[in-house]
Design a protein with these regions (language model features):
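Short, intrinsically disordered, charge-balanced linker/junction segments flanking boundaries
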Residues: 305-312
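Alpha-helical coiled-coil/heptad-repeat oligomerization segments
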Residues: 187-188, 206, 224, 242
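A short, structural motif
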Residues: 2-3, 14, 21, 28, ...
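One face of beta-strands
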Residues: 8-14
Length: 312
């Protein structure tokens, strides 16, 4: 089962700069290798900024509607002013900020809402608060764009804002990437179908530390999930558990695992030896094994070796 799951996709080996290019290259390679077995995949990797433009278009009328009460007088203007004042107090009490700190975040929430994001200023507040709490690596000057991106992804993929920001925060913390890079990966991943079981953001938050520890990059993590998704895996947990189990088994180095590596190519055996000497990562071994399994003519043997090293 495991060999069948991965054999179409070969080794990981991503070297492109952006998430769009990475997943687009994989899409092209999969279409060519599958030789018509799959329908043409939807082009992945639309920048989050482009996705966000769609939401801003929807919000254009709201922006126009907001400008009048802000500039006008009477009850509507008083209501808006009161909402903004309440917004700042909510932010301050939720985050324990100084009055000045809450004022600065209140301005961000106000501008975000005026740009057409959220059904109310309260919704924007909660989104900004989650970005601030879960994405601690985001610089202050990027909080507005990060909030807009998080809200856009939440709406687009019908996901909770807390899960969106937790996932993005874990990508930033573990892989050292920017908020834009994290959101671009989610936009590309979502368009590749990674949220089919409605767990993409939560799974990334859970497994990002494991992938980092194993030596994978953020792009490689999403590529592995995309490969498994295209092959019809039940859910992302199944895919990520395979990677987790693989790491455990190669670290353990049981006789069954060692015997399996003895049946693989000299190149993969060398990678395995280097890993055991502390000169490589689980990711190096993972890539080498997938390369071997994909090239084997004897698919029964490939499946047996895959089960031996992956545990399934």
């Amino acid at each position: 089962m495991l060999a069948e799951m991965f054999q179409l996709f070969g080794t990981i080996g991503i070297k492109a700069d952006g998430a769009y290019k990475d997943l687009k290259q994989f899409e092209d390679r999969v279409q060519k290798t599958a030789n018509g077995m799959h329908d043409k995949f939807q082009k992945a990797g639309e920048s989050i900024s482009h996705v966000g433009n769609k939401m801003k278009d929807v919000g254009t009328n709201m922006t126009a509607g907001v400008s009048l009460p802000l500039a006008g007088i009477g009850a509507a203007a008083v209501k808006v002013a009161s909402d903004f004042d309440t917004s700042q107090r909510n932010i301050q009490s939720s985050l324990g900020l100084t009055e000045k700190g809450a004022e600065n975040l209140g301005k961000i929430a106000k501008e975000t809402w005026k740009d057409g994001f959220g059904q109310s200023i309260e919704e924007v507040d909660q989104s900004l608060i989650k970005v601030y709490q879960n994405m601690k690596e985001v610089p202050h000057e990027e909080l507005e764009e990060a909030t807009k991106s998080a809200m856009t992804l939440g709406k687009t993929f019908d996901s909770d804002i807390n899960e969106v920001t937790r996932g993005a925060g874990q990508l930033m913390t573990n892989f050292g990437i920017s908020s834009k890079e994290a959101f671009d990966l989610f936009a590309a991943g979502g368009q590749e179908g990674l949220n089919y079981s409605n767990e993409m953001f939560d799974n990334v938050a859970e497994y990002a530390p494991l992938y980092k520890q194993a030596g994978f990059s953020a792009n490689e993590m999403f590529t592995i999930m995309a490969n498994g998704t295209r092959d019809g895996s039940y859910n992302l947990d199944y895919i990520n558990d395979l990677v987790k189990e693989f790491g455990i088994r190669v670290q353990d180095g049981s006789k069954g695992v060692s015997d399996a590596f003895a049946e693989m190519s000299p190149q993969t055996q060398k990678v395995w030896d280097n890993f055991n000497k502390g000169k490589g990562t689980s990711a190096d071994v993972f890539n080498a094994v997938l390369g071997d399994l994909g090239k084997m003519d004897d698919k029964v043997k490939a499946n047996q070796l895959g089960v031996a090293v992956f545990g399934r």
